[in-house]
Design a protein with these regions (language model features):
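Sec-dependent N-terminal signal peptides of Gram-positive bacterial secreted proteins and lipoproteins
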Residues: 12-33
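Compositionally biased, intrinsically disordered low-complexity segments
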Residues: 1, 22-23, 38
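Low-complexity, intrinsically disordered short peptide segments enriched in small/polar/basic residues
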Residues: 6, 16-17, 38, 54
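Extracytoplasmic metal-acquisition and chelation regions
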Residues: 27-285
C-alpha cells in the first residue's frame, strides 16, 4: 500500500511538471491566445452544460472570449483525465468552471499550479450550496463493494457505517431549477470579468432563465397530469435532482456515481419485478 501511495505521489508530481512546462510553452509561443496577447477573456469549462450556459450568457459578445470545453461529448466524466495540453489551458484561464464532485478529484491539483493567479475558480457544487444532495442508495440498488442489492430493511436502518465520508451527487445540471440558480451565479462572475458589458450579460441571462423557468413549468404540468410517477432505471442513476424536483419515485441498478457498470442477475430481476409492480412500461437505460 505504501509503495502504491508513493507511486501516486510521483505520478501527480510528474503531471504537475508537464503542466508547468506546457504552460510556459504556450506563454512564450502565444499559441493559446490568452488574455495577455489577444485581449480576450479565457474561460475553460469541464462539461457541456456549463459551456452551453455561458454561450447563452455572453451572446453577441462571444468574440470577446475564448470559450473552451475540455470534456467532449460522449466522454465519460467519471473516468476523464486531462492531458498536459488541457492542464495548460486551465493554467492560463481567467475563469475555470468545474462541477466540484467526486469525478473532479484531478481539478484540485490543476488549480494549485495556475499561471494566472487572478483566475476565477468556479466550483458549481459550492455555488449550489444547500441544494447539493447526498448520494442516495434506494431499495434494490447494487452495492459497489459487496455486490448485493439493498433491501428495504437495510435502507431504512442505515446499514452503511456512520464514519463513511459523505459523497454528494454531482449531476447537478440535470435539474432545471438548479440550472436557473447556476446561470445567474455564472453571470455574476462573468460581469466581474467584463464590467463594460455587464448589462448585456445580465439581459442575456434573464432571457435564458425565463426559458428555463418556462421549461420547469412544462415539466410540472406534464408530471402532475401523469398517472405513473415511478421511474425504473437500468444503469447508474444521474437524475436524483430531477426526481426530487417533481416528487417522482425511482428504482435503479446503481447510484449516480457508482463504479459499477454490470448489473447482477439479482438486480436485473428486482428491477423487472418493479416494472410489473408499478405498471411502468419499460426499464430506462
Amino acid at each position: 500500500e505504501r509503495s502504491r501511495g508513493l507511486g501516486d505521489v510521483y505520478k501527480r508530481q510528474l503531471l504537475m511538471l508537464c503542466v508547468i512546462l506546457a504552460a510556459s510553452l504556450f506563454a512564450f509561443t502565444g499559441c493559446q491566445g490568452n488574455v495577455q496577447n489577444n485581449g480576450k477573456i479565457n474561460i475553460v469549462c469541464t462539461t457541456y452544460p456549463q459551456y452551453n450556459w455561458i454561450q447563452n450568457i455572453i451572446g453577441e459578445e462571444s468574440e470577446e472570449f475564448n470559450l473552451t470545453l475540455l470534456v467532449d461529448g460522449g466522454a465519460d466524466l467519471h473516468s476523464y483525465q486531462p492531458s498536459a495540453k488541457d492542464m495548460a489551458k486551465i493554467s492560463s484561464a481567467d475563469m475555470f468552471v468545474y462541477v466540484g464532485g467526486s469525478s473532479d478529484a484531478w481539478v484540485f491539483d490543476a488549480v494549485r499550479e495556475t499561471v494566472n493567479k487572478n483566475m476565477k475558480k468556479v466550483n458549481m457544487m459550492e455555488l449550489l450550496g444547500d441544494r447539493a444532495k447526498e448520494e442516495e442508495v434506494v431499495e434494490g440498488m447494487q452495492d459497489d463493494e459487496h455486490g448485493h442489492s439493498h433491501t428495504a430493511s437495510e435502507d431504512s436502518h442505515g446499514e452503511h457505517e456512520e464514519t463513511d465520508e459523505i459523497e454528494y451527487d454531482e449531476h447537478i445540471w440535470l435539474s432545471v431549477k438548479n440550472a436557473e440558480i447556476l446561470v445567474q451565479k455564472l453571470t455574476d462572475v462573468i460581469k466581474e470579468l467584463d464590467t463594460d458589458n455587464a448589462e448585456e450579460y445580465q439581459s442575456n441571462a434573464d432571457a435564458y432563465i425565463k426559458q428555463l423557468s418556462d421549461l420547469d413549468k412544462e415539466y410540472e404540468s406534464v408530471i402532475s397530469a401523469a398517472r405513473l410517477k415511478t421511474v425504473v432505471f437500468g444503469d447508474r442513476f444521474p437524475f436524483r435532482y430531477l426526481v426530487d424536483d417533481y416528487n417522482l419515485d425511482y428504482y435503479a441498478a446503481f447510484a449516480g456515481c457508482s463504479a459499477e457498470t454490470e448489473a447482477s442477475f439479482k438486480t436485473v430481476t428486482f428491477l423487472a419485478g418493479k416494472v410489473d409492480e408499478t405498471g411502468t412500461k419499460a426499464i430506462l437505460i
